[in-house]
């Protein structure tokens, strides 16, 4: 960003010395400048009034001279009165000379007073320029500070990127540890499957033993006298059945609660997925709104810049038109002055014109040398600007190539993001039955809410910035309108003043023409009286006039050649200025394009960082989801194995219960049969005592067998319970270990997420600070451009005022030359009057005449002239 300062010099040379004025680019001193210009205009108006008064007095003096000449003509008859009249005329002429000297002194005093005021104004302007330079140095220091802050922020961003890389490395290490833990979990799953296989084998052995027991029970069908013992066994089995039914009911209730919890988790996961989709839609909408605001603001800024450029072009066209009109008026004035100079037939005026022409030629030569120097400087500036333009174009091409690379990377990242989103959707569909996803979803929802709040804050900030930009734009438009109104007023005033000046010039020209005609009449009369002397003098002066005309023609030719050279140089300067403006405009456009490309690069970089962050978060969520999926699968497998075992136990118990119920029915039937048989046998007891003894022996044998079988059944049941307890304890330990490991991993994940959130917050703060600094630099750049535009407008106004001052000085110099010329004409007229008086005295000495008048009755007046001529023999 290059700072540009402009300084304009104005030099005017007068009788007292050179006056140099420096105009600086201070917006705050506009009002002071306008007040000073008003004071200068008032001084100029007072000087004009003084000069008008001098011209009136001069016209009065010319009238008095004409009256004196008339009196001289009337007083030719009386010599005594002529002497008195000559004395009176001498006194009047001395008075007139004193008056002219006083007027000249007053005009010099007023000019000296104006120069003093001008020098004071110049001193004040120089003080203002010093203040402006100090303010400019302060602004440059602040800009350097801002640049240093920007560099520090960039260094901080690089440090955050390095920290991000280290965090990625730690995440990769954690992923490796998670992979090792997964391998361990798979090994534990294998051990669990082996335990389940052993359990199934034991259950098969248990079933075989139960079959043997059933066969033994079938062998007990023939026992009829075990009613009481079997009843006790039935009661025991009933109690066991009731206990098992209670256990089954508790297991069914726990299964029902688990199913209800799983269904609620499914519903919550579906709601969270819907909420996440809604949050993503809101994010997309917010991004679209931000992009729309951004595009709208950029289009409005571009339109405003186009309007400002159009206004600048229109102002430049109007200024060029006014300059052409002024040049045409100046050419007209110069033509009028040339015509007047051709009409002037006196030698002294021609000599003065020659001196002026030589001085003007010298000034023009100096100006030509200055213009050549300016031309060389402008050419060097144009070459430097072309070099800068080429450098900026190269940088722009490099930036465009970098932007294309970033866009290509951004598209790749977008494709990866789409693929990850698809995988994420699949994982979300697969993880519909996981418990841990609920906490993750709640945390994500909270993070999304924070991001939504942040986006809303950014949107509010953007809206506030947009409103501020709108207010600034309105203020600038009001300033432009006010400046255009002031320009229109100034233009109207200067047009009115130009018209007044033209009218004054026309009136002066008419007066001078009348005076010239009167003088020509008087000269013609004097020439009629003094032909001989005038013829001699005429011949002498005609030769001088021809010589002077030749020299004047040569000077005019030189002047015309110099004016042509000056016009050519002015055309070249205007072309170079236009080329310079065009190059400067192209440079400005390149700088704007470079700033826009930098902003786009920054936006793309920010989007790329966001996409990287989103990719990392998606990868983390994917890994967490995979872990939770594996854990849930392991838990589901465990639950399925437990359910299978419970179902097998349930089926086993149901089969045992059905077998026991069948045994109970059979025993009930057998009891009835036994009762009948007992009733029969009671009758036949006596006859069957021998059979009873045998049966008692058999009964003792059966009881011994029964006791041995009961002992074996009890041992088997104890072994079964021990195996089931060992299996359940081992599964619970494994589950407890896995749950503890899952909790540790979740805690580590939460810590990593917190760290990541903190780093993201720091990055967002740094990005926000960088954006604020960029906005401040852009606003400073805009204010600098606005100040430059205002300075250019002020410079144009100052140029117009300079031209007016130059014109006023030229007019004052012309009026002074006219006064001097009229003084010379008066002196020449006095000399001629003296010569005429001497001639009259000679004529009167030669011829004496008496004038007698007589009144004839009837109203006629008779004049008798008697002449007496004296001749010397």
From Swiss-Prot:
Protein origin, superkingdom: Eukaryota
Localization terms from the record: Cytoplasm, Myofibril
Keyword Cytoplasm among record annotations: yes
Keyword line: Coiled coil, Cytoplasm, Motor protein, Muscle protein, Myosin, Thick filament
Region (Nonhelical region) residue spans: 1-25, 853-873
GO cellular component: bicellular tight junction; myofibril; myosin complex; myosin filament
Gene3D superfamilies per the UniProt record, alphabetical: 1.20.5.340, 1.20.5.370, Vasodilator-stimulated phosphoprotein (1.20.5.1160)
Coiled coil: 26-852
Tissue note: Expressed in all tissues except in saliva.
Record flagged with keyword Cytoplasm: yes
Family: Belongs to the paramyosin family.
Primary role: Paramyosin is a major structural component of many thick filaments isolated from invertebrate muscles.
Quaternary data: Homodimer. Binds IgG and collagen.
Protein name: Paramyosin
């Amino acid at each position: 960003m290059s700072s540009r300062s402009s300084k304009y010099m104005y030099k005017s040379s007068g009788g007292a010395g050179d006056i140099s004025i420096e105009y600086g680019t201070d917006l705050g001193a506009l009002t002071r400048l306008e007040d000073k210009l008003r004071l200068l205009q008032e001084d100029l108006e007072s000087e004009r009034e003084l000069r008008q008064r001098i011209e009136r007095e001069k016209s009065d003096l010319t009238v008095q001279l004409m009256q004196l000449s008339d009196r001289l003509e009337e007083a030719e008859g009386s010599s005594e009165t002529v002497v008195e009249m000559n004395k009176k005329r001498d006194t009047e002429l001395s008075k007139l000379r004193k008056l002219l000297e006083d007027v000249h002194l007053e005009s010099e005093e007023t000019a000296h007073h104006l120069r003093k005021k001008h020098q004071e104004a110049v001193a004040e302007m120089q003080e203002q320029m010093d203040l402006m330079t100090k303010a400019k140095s302060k602004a440059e220091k602040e800009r350097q500070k801002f640049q240093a802050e920007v560099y520090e922020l960039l260094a901080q961003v690089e440090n955050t990127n390095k920290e991000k890389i280290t965090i990625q490395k730690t995440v990769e290490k954690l992923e490796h540890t998670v992979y090792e833990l997964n391998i361990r979990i798979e090994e534990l799953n294998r051990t669990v499957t082996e335990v389940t296989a052993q359990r199934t084998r034991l259950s098969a052995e248990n079933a075989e033993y139960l079959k043997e027991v059933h066969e033994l029970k079938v062998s007990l069908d023939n026992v009829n006298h075990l009613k009481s013992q079997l009843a006790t066994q039935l009661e025991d089995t009933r109690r066991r059945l009731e206990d098992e039914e209670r256990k089954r009911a508790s297991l069914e209730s726990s299964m029902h609660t688990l199913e209800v919890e799983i269904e609620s988790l499914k519903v919550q996961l579906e709601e969270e997925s819907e909420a996440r989709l809604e949050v993503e839609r809101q994010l997309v909408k917010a991004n679209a709104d931000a992009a729309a605001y951004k595009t709208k603001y950029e289009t409005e800024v571009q339109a405003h810049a186009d309007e400002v450029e159009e206004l600048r072009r229109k102002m430049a066209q109007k200024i060029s038109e006014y300059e052409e009109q002024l040049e045409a008026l100046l050419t007209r004035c110069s033509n009028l002055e040339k015509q007047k100079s051709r009409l002037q037939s006196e030698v002294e005026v021609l000599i003065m014109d020659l001196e002026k022409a030589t001085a003007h030629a010298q000034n023009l030569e100096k100006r030509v040398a200055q213009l050549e120097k300016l031309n060389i400087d402008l050419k060097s500036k144009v070459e430097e600007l072309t070099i800068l333009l080429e450098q900026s174009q190269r940088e722009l091409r490099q930036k465009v190539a970098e932007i294309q690379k970033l866009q290509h990377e951004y598209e790749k990242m977008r494709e990866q993001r789409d693929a990850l989103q698809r995988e994420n959707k699949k994982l979300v569909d697969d993880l519909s039955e996981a418990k841990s996803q609920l906490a993750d979803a709640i945390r994500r929802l909270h993070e999304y809410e924070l991001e939504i709040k942040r986006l809303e804050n950014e949107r509010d900030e953007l809206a506030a910035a947009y409103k501020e930009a709108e207010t600034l734009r309105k203020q600038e438009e009001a300033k432009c309108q006010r400046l255009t109104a002031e320009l229109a007023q100034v233009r109207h005033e200067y047009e009115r003043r130009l018209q007044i000046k033209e009218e004054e010039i026309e009136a002066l020209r008419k007066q001078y023409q009348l005076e010239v005609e009167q003088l020509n009449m008087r000269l013609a009369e004097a020439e009629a009286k003094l032909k001989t002397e005038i013829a001699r003098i005429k011949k002498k002066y005609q030769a001088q006039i021809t010589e002077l005309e030749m020299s004047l023609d040569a000077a005019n030719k030189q002047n015309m050649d110099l004016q042509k050279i000056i016009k050519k140089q002015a055309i070249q300067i205007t072309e170079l200025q236009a080329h310079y403006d065009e190059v400067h405009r192209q440079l400005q456009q390149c700088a704007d394009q470079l700033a826009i490309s930098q902003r786009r690069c920054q936006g793309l970089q920010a989007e790329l960082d966001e996409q990287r962050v989103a990719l990392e978060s998606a990868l983390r969520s994917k890994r967490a989801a995979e872990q939770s999926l594996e854990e849930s699968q392991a838990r589901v497998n465990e639950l399925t194995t437990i359910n299978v075992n419970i179902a097998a136990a349930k089926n086993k118990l149901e089969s045992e219960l059905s077998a026991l119920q069948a045994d109970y029915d059979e025993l009930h039937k057998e009891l009835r049969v036994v009762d009948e048989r007992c009733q029969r046998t009671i009758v036949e007891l006596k006859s069957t005592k021998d059979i009873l003894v045998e049966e008692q022996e058999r009964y003792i044998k059966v009881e011994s067998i029964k006791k041995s079988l009961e002992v074996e059944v009890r041992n088997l049941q104890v072994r079964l319970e021990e195996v089931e307890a060992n299996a359940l304890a081992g599964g619970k330990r494994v589950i407890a270990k896995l749950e503890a490991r899952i909790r540790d991993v979740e805690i580590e994940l939460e810590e990593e997420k917190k760290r990541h959130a903190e780093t993201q917050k720091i990055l967002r703060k740094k990005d926000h600070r960088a954006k604020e600094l960029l906005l401040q630099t852009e606003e400073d750049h805009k204010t600098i451009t606005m100040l430059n535009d205002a300075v250019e407008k002020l410079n144009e106004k100052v140029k117009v005022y300079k031209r007016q001052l130059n014109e006023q000085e030229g007019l004052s110099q012309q009026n002074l030359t006219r006064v001097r010329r009229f003084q010379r004409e008066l002196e020449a007229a006095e000399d001629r009057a003296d010569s005429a008086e001497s001639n009259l005295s000679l004529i009167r000495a030669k011829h004496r005449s008496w004038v007698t008048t007589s009144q004839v009755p009837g109203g006629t007046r008779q004049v008798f002239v008697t002449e007496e001529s004296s001749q010397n023999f």
